[in-house]
Amino acid sequence: MKSHSLAIAGLLSQYLPENAITGVLANIAVETGGSFDYTQKQKNGPGYGLFQFDYQKPYYFKYLEKEGLNDSAESQVMFMADAVYNNKSDAEGNYTGALDLGGPARKAIQKSFNEGSTADVTKTFSEKYEKPSKPNMDERLKSAEDFDKFKGLFTNPLSLP
């Protein structure tokens, strides 16, 4: 089920600030080998989906069940956005979101999304959320540079001529 990068950018624009879209999209491009397929499986590994969920996979499927959602590109983006932006905890101070990245990681990603350059967003998201065994950072940064040429078009891709 291949999705075009513009469709994924449109989904990201519903949950992330404009500043973050190209950096996250670049990470997805590398994670999926350019397919942008939310069912993409890692070759010889456990990774799955747009973000190649590895350790996150059981948390993701629990999130789907709890929220009554089906697996989809949008559900994966929603799960990622929840992990980044959900700062809620219970009365004892235990984190209540679907995936606990840790407060410092969440804050670093949020700050990068709001204030960082495309390169900063790309690196921070890779290091604090994706946590790949092989970062391929040069490839991520090159992809971000390519997507950055279209920055500003991602907020409402359906309005393109």
Region spans (language model):
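Short, functionally critical alpha-helical segments immediately adjacent to catalytic or ligand/cofactor-binding
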Residues: 19-35, 80, 123-126
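Extracellular cell-wall/glycan-interacting regions and their flexible linkers
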Residues: 1-25, 135-161
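Active-site or metal-binding loop neighborhoods of secreted/extracellular toxin and effector enzymes
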Residues: 107-157
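Peptidoglycan-targeting cell-wall enzymes and recognition modules
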Residues: 1-15, 32-117
